[in-house]
């Protein structure tokens, strides 16, 4: 009887150790940290472009747009995966930035993977458009 009791106690101890070890690994492992990317609004050579014009990011990352040259600028998303107008509006910054180094940002958290295209309202006709590709 005492042999069975000792075996049960040892099995309980082993099981408890495995559970505690598994929880420690789960809580202490570092998930991939979210990144922040910078897109200049207007190139250093005063061209009406987003620099870089295309950017590939992961879900959870943030993009900051910095007013660089030849302002005013803004960021308006027109095409997003699934044609979700509410998501496009949430990511957009329609107010014009009128001073150097002003920043707006969008966090791409809980968004579907795919291509997101955007433009600058005053300079869209001049070709000031950009694209963000979100990996799944």
Curated annotation (Swiss-Prot):
Membrane-related topology note: Peripheral membrane protein
PANTHER family: PLASTOCYANIN MAJOR ISOFORM, CHLOROPLASTIC-RELATED
Family statement: Belongs to the plastocyanin family.
Leader sequence residues: 1-34
NCBIfam families listed in its UniProt record: cyanin_plasto
Cofactor names: Cu(2+)
Binding site residues for Cu cation: 73, 120, 123, 128
Location in the cell: Cellular thylakoid membrane
Organism annotation: Synechococcus sp. (strain JA-2-3B'a(2-13))
Any Gene Ontology CC annotation: plasma membrane-derived thylakoid membrane
Function: Participates in electron transfer between P700 and the cytochrome b6-f complex in photosystem I.
CDD domains: Plastocyanin (cd04219)
Keywords: Copper, Electron transport, Membrane, Metal-binding, Signal, Thylakoid, Transport
Protein name: Plastocyanin
């Amino acid at each position: 009887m005492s042999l069975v009791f000792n075996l049960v106690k040892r099995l309980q101890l082993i099981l408890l150790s495995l559970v505690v070890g598994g929880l420690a690994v789960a809580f202490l492992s570092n998930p991939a940290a979210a990144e922040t990317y910078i897109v200049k609004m207007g190139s250093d050579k005063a061209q009406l472009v987003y620099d870089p014009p295309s950017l590939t990011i992961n879900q959870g990352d943030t993009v900051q747009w910095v007013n660089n040259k030849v302002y005013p600028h803004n960021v308006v998303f027109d095409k997003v995966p699934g044609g979700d107008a509410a998501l496009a509006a949430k990511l957009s910054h329609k107010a014009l930035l009128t001073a150097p180094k002003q920043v707006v940002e969008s966090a791409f958290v809980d968004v579907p993977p795919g291509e997101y295209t955007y433009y600058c309202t005053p300079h869209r006709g001049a070709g000031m458009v950009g694209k963000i590709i979100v990996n799944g």
